[in-house]
Design a protein with these regions (language model features):
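C-terminal beta-strand-loop-alpha-helix "lid" module of Rossmann-like NAD(P)-dependent dehydrogenases
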Residues: 1-288
Length: 288
């Protein structure tokens, strides 16, 4: 009987866990759908800003102020800024692993070249994975908020702008997972600074911009850096929720399979006990 009690207790426990994983799956699915809409709504704006910035590279750099030129030119003997975007929480499969692996490989390559490195880490999981080995490279660490991330984007943008203007860094690369679908996230290494020229020169020849107004280029640089952070953050969050949704779906299915096996085991044990009791009753009646 104690064996049956243990099985019933375990079935109850697994069912309770299944309810939690199912709820987490539904929450992640809802969040992912919302973020996908945000990505769709912001794509045109981000592409337009990036296009204008790449076109500026084709103009004479002497038309820009000294501070503005720092965002378009690689300055020798300055640190490489690596922005690492990971998750704040776990339970999202290998979401963070591919990012951390690529960052470590790139750091090793930069170290072999004798180059300086600075890290900006966004998300607790990335910080925990890198702080022990690369604590001396970490310039800033930001926790990822559950909702509204406007303040986070502002802080990261200000930090990047400050490092570039003060000639502490030259190259800036951001690492994040790009969303493809709920089951597939693509590890992405995207250069933010210096701004790269559009490789399709025909586009630049066909478009013409007149840059007028005080601080117009500086304002555009601000918008560009902010848009790059926003793009990476949205992609990363959609990927994280997709990975978590898939992980929780798998956990829910596994729990369901385990419950079926435990119920079958419980029924067989009960049948065995009943059979034994019947045999004992029959044997007792025959003895009488």
């Amino acid at each position: 009987m104690s064996h049956l009690k243990q099985l019933r207790t375990r079935i109850k426990s697994v069912k309770s866990t299944q309810k939690i994983t199912k709820a987490m799956q539904l929450v992640s699915a809802s969040k992912m759908a919302k973020i996908k809409n945000q990505i769709a709504n912001s794509n045109f704006y981000i592409e337009a800003i990036s296009k204008m910035m790449s076109d500026i590279v084709s103009i004479d750099m002497y038309e820009l102020s000294i501070e503005e030129q720092k965002f378009f030119n690689t300055i020798p003997n300055k640190a490489n800024l690596l922005i690492v975007m990971t998750s704040q929480r776990g339970l999202c499969r290998t979401f963070n692993y591919s990012i951390i692996k690529q960052v470590k490989n790139d750091i090793k390559e930069l170290e072999n070249k004798g180059e300086q490195i600075k890290l900006i880490i966004i998300g607790k999981k990335g910080y925990e994975a890198l702080k022990r080995q690369y604590a001396n490279y970490i310039d800033s660490y930001f926790e990822l908020p559950n909702i509204h991330a406007e303040n986070l984007m502002l802080q990261v943008k200000q930090k990047i702008m400050s490092l570039v203007v003060n000639l502490e860094v030259s190259n800036c690369v951001i690492y994040f997972n790009k969303f493809k679908n709920a089951m597939t996230q693509i590890m992405t290494r995207q250069q933010v600074l210096p701004v790269e020229k559009d490789h399709d020169d025909s586009k630049i020849e066909n478009d013409h911009y007149e840059y007028e107004g005080e601080n117009l280029i500086s304002n555009l640089i601000n918008l560009y850096v902010n848009s790059q952070i926003n793009y990476a953050l949205l992609q990363s969050r959609a990927s994280e929720e997709g990975a978590r949704m898939t992980a929780m779906e798998n956990a829910t299915n596994n729990a369901n399979d385990l419950i079926s096996k435990l119920v079958l085991k419980l029924n067989r044990s009960r049948q065995a006990i009943i059979t034994t009791e019947l045999i004992e009753i029959v044997a007792g009646s025959e003895a009488v």
